[in-house]
């Protein structure tokens, strides 16, 4: 199955696949996502998001309603849509190849989850989050999912994402390469990010969030494994 991501920073005709390492794909705008509306979105006739015999699930986050701004908080100027109330931003930038440089994300303070992809190369999706002290791969390109990836990673500082090269700079900051990052910051009573230890029992651990969650995503972080997504729909 194809898992597709669209956003208004990159343009709605440009698709990335979260379950593959393929490059950003630009189709005829009449094929897939054709419009972002005030109360939803419109689809074209492409069989991936709109096959007449299939049922689909989709999740949406509002950033800044499609209005971007230039952000110079980091060493690299980024284009940002940020929703500080919801703790979510979309960041696009062009890498400069300098190890340790930073890029602004538009949310105050430190981020909690950052999902980042090189748009023009078949580099891995890179994921870092609070509570793991690790970088995990959304997809490793071979059908598997890897934990403890250390060839490139992101660090936290107030207002910026640190882009560190430990052997594969193209994943996060290759010279003249284009990137997108989806950045989340925890908002009390609305979102929660962290880790827990399983016990292998049918009476599993209670994971405190402080609210009734509508959407949960989890995966094992000490070994390879699949990401699992649950929602109330």
PLM segments and residue spans:
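Surface-exposed molecular-recognition determinants
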Residues: 1-233
